[in-house]
Amino acid sequence: MLNIILPSLPYQRTVDPMWQEEMDVARGCGYSVCLFDAEQEKLYHQPNVAYPTLYRGWMLSEVEYQQLAHMTSLLVSTEMYLASHQANGWYDSITGFTPRGSIVAAGAAGVSVEFFLKQGGRCFVKGISKSFGSESVISSGAEFEALLQKHEVASKDLLFIREFVELSSQPEQRFFVVRKGAFGAAEAQLPETLKPALGALKNRWFYTVDVAYTQTGQPVIIEVGDGQVSDIKEWSVAELYSKVIHRLAELAA
């Protein structure tokens, strides 16, 4: 059994409509559902202390997650959350399975940008937990400076500078991982060549691995994320709960 914490509307004891389906499915599975208002730093409906508690909702900053963790004991600790949510928590562990990159403060990132531009003519720039959308792909130092200015990136903010890899048209897949067990939508299997990466990430309870394929058909890990704040992408909510959350509840019991 689990307690599931979902986002409420700001200043309201009502689930955010974007998470209504998850609330319905979670309750249908017999889980206790609580609501968290990040704006007020308020938790509605205290979780049952006899059960582990899992957050499912919008991305939280380190401070916001700590605030939630202070209100109730969470299955995923703040340290574990950040280790999956931020690139500096996972990149070094799986360098052989993901495109090359460098994590560096924005004020000192010019060298890394120049290096990757010389390598392939383009590079990918993102924050350690979020991309800049279509603007993340740049082809010059001037574009990099414009990106920093537009998004008001401070010189001390960490950036993830990555080589640009041409990918095939095959759709990217999101795998939810519970400990070392990876689950794909519609019974998709994690490629064998990427399974050793799960061993390098084994200290995490619940995370996601996004897999894409190069133009030569090689599978690569594009991103690791915390499973609590990851969108379901090609999954249905029902499948997520029947497979992934069910397994998580079994192991956490």
Protein language model features and the residues they cover:
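Hydrophobic, Leu/Ile/Phe/Ala-enriched alpha-helical segments that form helix-helix packing faces
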Residues: E22-G30, T72, I94, G120, ...
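Active-site nucleotide/adenylate-binding loops and adjacent lid/helix of ATP-dependent enzymes
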Residues: N3-P17, Q46-N48, R56-Q173, V177-K195
